[in-house]
């Protein structure tokens, strides 16, 4: 089986990750003790992708829970799934990273990293045929961003040919926890550009908007936001976990989605989003589902795809849907909005269909877009970064951990390069010889 090793780092990563395990345990019929109570063989057919089978038919998530302080771990342990995870896979420090990227990446995190890598090796050795790794973390804090990127870099060295995916929560301007978020996020993106194959960008602001506007929740809390994230994560990983007519694994997704190795930051979306009360009153046709999937209001990151163009898109449908109708609707969407798709990548929309819908849905769709509009998200962080870095504000927190200002400048220019690469591919037409004229002067 193509196994995945799941890692979650920091407070945000552990909360989102735990919610994800709740969601997929429900889908696979695994209760909180790890016993199977499902009603369909399909639930067990590819269960090895995420679970190890322990003694007495108990299923144990192949998950590592990592944090630099014990608090979040304790709440996961006492939560609904506390007994499900393997006790040895809780790896935590005592000091905390204090929202400081340098502590997570260079000092505190570096002390814990060997312990984490030992558990990673143990999990990988038990695999039949390891497909890759996925990491849940946020980019605004200290542990998820600093230690998370350190972990990715280390695993990349040791398993260079395995796919590396991250679900990264990008800090948003309206929902901010700490002043140094722009620093932490920029330093993290600097690492992610080089070290991951696919990064799904999730944004608290977009999640709040969905809760307010679409789900009509008067005061959404973090568990509502995490529920949305877990729906999306479950959708993205559907085709790995269930047999369907079109199965794609993470590597196929990467091949279809990443036209240039640096541009691997995706905007995920989910449909149908309806408030819990009105859900049962709506029947969702494929037409409606497709329309919703491409709607900016359903995107989990705060950028508007209509401000840019899609390089590639993957659409995953779940439920009893007709393949032909799915293909027709997607084609229709593409022809009607052809200006929003770059014309130099023909058939750049990939569809996958899985027969098993998520819990509580008849049909559902997950959307993954590689759009040039995501530069809005990076530009926002970059502007905040520059404003603070120009004044060298808060820099002593980082330099006292042994970081150099040089590293900040590098991260800043790498982020700006990324933004201009997206911009460049947004503007290029089918007949522009972009590569040739740039390559000429080097001779």
Curated annotation (Swiss-Prot):
Family: Belongs to the tubulin family.
GO biological process: microtubule-based process
Binding site for GTP: 11, 69, 138, 142-144, 204, 226
Source organism per UniProt: Echinococcus multilocularis (Fox tapeworm)
Keyword presence, Metal-binding: yes
SMART domains: Tubulin, Tubulin_C
Any single GO CC term annotated in Swiss-Prot or TrEMBL for this entry: cytoplasm
InterPro entries per UniProt: Beta-tubulin_BS (IPR013838), Beta_tubulin (IPR002453), Tub_FtsZ_C (IPR008280), Tubulin (IPR000217), Tubulin/FtsZ-like_C (IPR037103), Tubulin/FtsZ_2-layer-sand-dom (IPR018316), Tubulin/FtsZ_GTPase_sf (IPR036525), Tubulin_C (IPR023123)
UniProt keyword list: Cytoplasm, Cytoskeleton, GTP-binding, Magnesium, Metal-binding, Microtubule, Nucleotide-binding
Location(s), subcellular: Cytoplasm, Cytoskeleton
Protein name stated in the entry: Tubulin beta-3 chain
